[in-house]
Amino acid sequence: MKIPVDKLTRAFKMGASVKKDSDTPVRVSVYLDSSASRFLAETVRDAFVPQTTSGIVRVERLGEERIAPKTDTDVVLVLSCGSDRLESAVQELVIAGAPVCVLAESAVEVPFVEESTPMLGVVAATDKTYLLETLARWILDRTDKETAFAANFAFMRIAAANRIITSCALTNMATGALVFLPGADYPVMALAQVGMLFELAAIFGRGIKPERGYEVAGVLAGGLVIRAVTRALVKQTPHIGFAVKALTAAAGTYGMGRALVSLYERDVDYSRANEVVTATFSRVRDLVTTVAGATRPMASYQDASDLAA
C-alpha cells in the first residue's frame, strides 16, 4: 500500500507546525514564601531550568506588598509551608488571571484550598518524584502550550508523551473500527503516527532534522507490519473484524509510541547511519555517471549507422 504524496506533504507540514509549537514562548512565575522549605526550593530550582530560549522563569520573594505578575505569565507557582500572608497572596495571583498552584509539603499547610479548580490547585508532597509528576499533570491540564512546556522542562516530558501517545492510539482505534474499505485505513493511521513521531521528537528536544527520516521510515514499516498482523487476525475472526482492527491499531500505535520515547530518551547517534547512506548515494551516483558515459558513444554509433542506411 502506497502513501499518497499529498499525505506525506501534510505529514511534513505537521512537523513544521510542531516545531513552531515547541518554540512558543513559555513564562513561569515562581513566588517563594519565607516559610518554604529547602526541599521545595531546591526541587523547583532544579526542575525549572528552560531548555530553549523561548522559556523564561521569573522568581520573586513573597512579600507584604501587593503582587502583580506580568500579563504574559502562563502559570504561577507559590512555594510555601504555610504563613499568614499566603491566602491573601494567592487571591491576588488568581485575580491576575494565570493558573496558580501552591506547592507545599502537606495540604494542611494550605487549608483554604479545599479542591483543585481550573485556576487554583495544591500539590503537596515530600517526595520529589511524586511532586514533579503531579505538578506536570496539573500544568498540562491547564495550558494549551503542552509541547512548549515539555520541550523546556524535562520533568514534564513523560507526562506529555503519555498524552500524545494515548491520543494517537485512540484516534487510530477509531480509524480501525470505522474504516471498512480494505487498505484505506493505512494512510490515515500512518499520517497520525508520523505526526505523533514529530510531537515526541519536539518535546524531547530532538528537533525536526534529516535524521527523523530514519524514524519515519521505521514508523511506516511498522504500520505495514501492524496491517499484516491485523489482516491475519481478521481472517480468523471475521465476525468481530472491526473490533480486532480497532484493538490492533490502538495496541500497535501505543507500542510504536513507547518505542519512540525510549529512542528519544537515549538520544541515538545517527552519524554511522549517515555515513553509510552518504557512501551508498555516492556509489550509486558514480555508477549512474559511468553507465551514462558508456552509453553515449553507443548512441552516437547507432545514429551514424542510421544515417548510412
For the regions a protein language model found, what residue spans apply to each?
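Low-complexity, polar/amphipathic intrinsically disordered segments that mediate membrane, lipid-surface
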Residues: 2-3, 46, 50-51, 66-70, ...
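Membrane-inserting effector segments that mediate pore formation, membrane fusion
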Residues: 162-255, 259
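Canonical P-loop GTPase G-domain recognition
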Residues: 40, 56-62, 97-149
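Acidic, carboxylate-rich catalytic segments that either coordinate divalent cations
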Residues: 261, 265-309
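Extended, compositionally biased accessory segments flanking or bridging domains
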Residues: 1-61
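Structural motif
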Residues: 30-35, 78-83, 103-107
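C-terminal-of-GTPase-core extension/linker across diverse P-loop GTPases
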Residues: 6, 125-133, 137-177
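A short, well-structured beta->alpha microelement
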Residues: 45-74, 81-90
